[in-house]
Amino acid sequence: MKKSLLGLTFASLMFSAGSAVAADYKIDKEGQHAFVNFRIQHLGYSWLYGTFKDFDGTFTFDEKNPAADKVNVTINTTSVDTNHAERDKHLRSADFLNTAKYPQATFTSTSVKKDGDDLDITGDLTLNGVTKPVTLEAKLIGQGDDPWGGKRAGFEAEGKIKLKDFNIKTDLGPASQEVDLIISVEGVQQK
């Protein structure tokens, strides 16, 4: 009986310790500590940079068990900004993002794997009415206590998507078939 009680207590402690390791975070967009950026070559001569100004998301981070990590992000595609009003209007049109019909893009992770010091985050990206798997390579920038009594964790992730994979058929030339994604987020741990 003592062995059973001891085993049950040990198992209970192990379960409690394991579940306490994973932490849930809300992306800190209000504090301007998160960015969803992209770049694409312009006719093969230069890079055109842009950002989405309105998005929201959460992530679960467990440094010891990446398989338990999760990422969920929703982007308001009408918030696209390339620092040029007419171009932004064109990007919102049916030629590109078709924001009248598809005002949101979403990313929901399906797996997270450790790759050396990096994390490979694979998930379903829904953009322009099409859902495709995308893998982002992420790096932990840092984590710890903040000056206001909370805890934070920050990551930077990069990936590529092909325009035609998401039913964006406007041809900008051979050097402009893919978009680079550059995402930087800082999350505030939820209590």
Curated annotation (Swiss-Prot):
Which UniProt keywords are given for this protein, alphabetically ordered? Periplasm, Signal
Q: Which SMART domains match?
A: YceI
InterPro entries hit by this protein:
Lipid/polyisoprenoid-bd_YceI, TTHA0802/YceI-like_sf, UPF0312/YceI
Which region is the signal sequence? Answer: 1-22
Q: Name one GO cellular component term.
A: periplasmic space
Location(s), subcellular: Periplasm
Which NCBIfam families does the UniProt record give? PRK03757.1 (NF002994)
Stated family: Belongs to the UPF0312 family. Type 1 subfamily.
The name of this protein is: Protein YceI
Q: What gene is behind this protein?
A: yceI
